[in-house]
């Protein structure tokens, strides 16, 4: 029987692995978005998901340069190692990196310690992101959010329509059958695009190991100065974190499953100092990686409310 007449199941076609399928889907989403929008940008938060997203983008558009810039919304409260890693990667890869900080929030001295997590996140993240998107007139923004991270992200589409005020309305979500993505929008509207939506935390780590993707050292276990506060191990990254009465930083072997502003990000005690050890911990984990993110605890439905206000 000729190959043309063989049943599809009998054709000697190479089978893609699980990670190859995820990679192909993400690359397709990126290329489709670039083809259908005028001025896209990639949000770069410096974490493991952003590192994977950047790696996929470099693959998607190789051997050419990325057809969009990277945007980092800098709250001024990221871990020092994160900023050093960001600058080193941008220099190494020759990236077009935009760094934006809310000037009003900076002038008012808004911070997670002085104003609390909710005000800090709104002013220095949500408002700052909206300002940056408006300033540079971006009509589509790639992000590294995944559906397995948190409930509101689980129900958001891969291509998420935002209003002219950058708000997300869950009732206006579009169907995405057969990997078909509707990238149409009215004047003033914009899109948030999530190529990693169908990845899990385990997928991310397996891909990082497979592709040897550089990541911030904070993900690996090491002795770090921490204080226990409200059930979280908070790293004392610089002198701006005031110690409460009776608090004394102590060195513990910890690492971070997720990264954000350091006073709002809890570490986990761990001996995992290599990628295989991190993968083993991830397989055994019974809690979400975002259990250490204080901003997710700002009341019931906190993340969905933030997204409706323009948060990523």
UniProtKB/Swiss-Prot annotation:
GO molecular function, one term: sulfate adenylyltransferase (ATP) activity
GO biological-process terms attached to the record: hydrogen sulfide biosynthetic process; sulfate assimilation
Keywords: ATP-binding, Nucleotide-binding, Nucleotidyltransferase, Transferase
Signal peptide (UniProt feature, chain positions): none
Pathway it works in: Sulfur metabolism; hydrogen sulfide biosynthesis; sulfite from sulfate: step 1/3
Gene3D superfamilies referenced in this protein's UniProt entry, alphabetically: HUPs (3.40.50.620)
A Pfam entry, by short name: PAPS_reduct
Catalytic activity: sulfate + ATP + H(+) = adenosine 5'-phosphosulfate + diphosphate
EC number(s) recorded for this UniProt protein: 2.7.7.4
Main EC class the enzyme belongs to: transferase
Its biological purpose: With CysN forms the ATP sulfurylase (ATPS) that catalyzes the adenylation of sulfate producing adenosine 5'-phosphosulfate (APS) and diphosphate, the first enzymatic step in sulfur assimilation pathway. APS synthesis involves the formation of a high-energy phosphoric-sulfuric acid anhydride bond driven by GTP hydrolysis by CysN coupled to ATP hydrolysis by CysD.
Assembly and interaction partners: Heterodimer composed of CysD, the smaller subunit, and CysN.
Similarity section: Belongs to the PAPS reductase family. CysD subfamily.
Protein's name according to its UniProt entry: Sulfate adenylyltransferase subunit 2
Organism: Methylobacterium nodulans (strain LMG 21967 / CNCM I-2342 / ORS 2060)
